[in-house]
Amino acid sequence: MAAAALLLLAAAAAAVVVAMALRWLLLLGGPAAGRQGKRARMPPGSTGLPLIGETLRLISAYKTPNPEPFIDERVARHGGVFTTHVFGERTVFSADPAFNRLLLAAEGRAVHSSYPSSIATLLGARSLLLTRGAAHKRLHSLTLTRLGRPASPPLLAHIDRLVLATMRQWEPAATVRLMDEAKKITFNLTVKQLVSIEPGPWTESLRREYVKLIDGFFSIPFPLACLLPFTTYGQALKARKKVAGALREVIKKRMEEKAENGGSIGDDEGKKEKKDMVEELLQAEGGSFSEEEMVDFCLSLLVAGYETTSVLMTLAVKFLTETPAALAELKEEHANIRDMKGKNQPLEWSDYKSMPFTQCVINETLRVGNIISGVFRRANTDIHYKDYTIPKGCKIFASFRAVHLNNEHYENARTFNPWRWQINNKLQNAVGANIFTPFGGGPRLCPGYELARVVVSIFLHHLVTRFSWEETEEDRLVFFPTTRTLKGYPINLRLLSESIC
């Protein structure tokens, strides 16, 4: 068995090397290169080492708390738009806010969304991230219908209950890994919105598999990975099958219930508010969504709801802890809200709108943390920008991080300063220039961005009005394969004497 496994691994590695070698030869002298002609000039840059390009340099930089030198050195040498070679492909890297805006707005015309094959396989071809054109438009519209209305009283009440239920499980003097706790909140909230299942053994089992699935996003997709379960990608494929199977069972049951009711969801089919995303899908467009479409769609929404919002919650607490003046002002804002409401009254939309400094904190956490570092696009046609021509088929990476942390756009850009977002601050003009893009933009603007803000705001409210805390050990940020803290940000909690948790 061991010998067979080694043979399979060797075959997989050989296949990867051959595929990368062929891709390298095509990039150097294939048809695309011939089409460029003498007049077409790619942005300057370096393709690095044969086969691997600059991939190892990029990964090495992004596995540190300070990946900026990778970008800074190339921008200083080549300008805000440069060529590199990462993840097996020549890629144009943009740190230019104007070009980034062009790319975001041109989705579906000059460019289309394009991600590594590992992500595409694990999410599914019908996921919100990977669909294009009319298919993406209808999925995006459905997501907005369900997740783009955070002012809904039932949704606000559920978020409030879920956050408090999680915090009540913490001991009065507990040590917790905040990122793990935040992920429980966001995962359970997303599952509730998708399939109306409350936290319990089913959701926890699903979450454990989902962690394995996400770990495989930026791993090497070996051709025989399905036969190599000991690899990260092989484990992710296995987890994907389990997650999809669990979602499929729920969806199939709901489809059967609809059929038994003569094509209706139930007695309340005519009600304006659908109970979850599956119900939205079953009734949308005359019930035209297939079972596989619904599975892929729900699976991809779990990624959006689970990973990014939980990291935002954790980084907000980390940055506040490192900036005592900001934490003090945030505590004052939320103490005032609690004093006006009373200790046991749930938060409402009017309370959320009374958190201006909280929104400054969230904006600054998004800007400094860059939970989404940027987006991949692929050119549908030759793109002419300044003196350069980016040929059809070329991959492009629009870096939000490079823009957000550039001192030309933000004063002391690499310092956490939530006051820069106050309305009377001149640096607020940065938003008007459309260079602040933590949720993307254009047709692929994140449909749940306002909901994410609401969840983080409610979480911060209950945290600062019920607990004090301190870091138990130093924990640092890394940005590959995703933005996170290495240790999950462990903190010691102390229940405030006047709080009722």
Curated annotation (Swiss-Prot):
GO terms for cellular component: membrane. Its cofactor is heme. InterPro entries: Cyt_P450 (IPR001128), Cyt_P450_CS (IPR017972), Cyt_P450_E_grp-I (IPR002401), Cyt_P450_sf (IPR036396). Belongs to the cytochrome P450 family. This is Cytochrome P450 90A4. Keywords: Heme, Iron, Membrane, Metal-binding, Monooxygenase, Oxidoreductase, Transmembrane, Transmembrane helix. The chain crosses the membrane at residues 2-22. Pathway: Plant hormone biosynthesis; brassinosteroid biosynthesis. Catalyzes the C23-alpha-hydroxylation step in brassinosteroid biosynthesis. Converts 6-deoxocathasterone to 6-deoxoteasterone in the late C6-oxidation pathway and cathasterone to teasterone (TE) in the early C6-oxidation pathway of brassinolide (BL) biosynthesis.
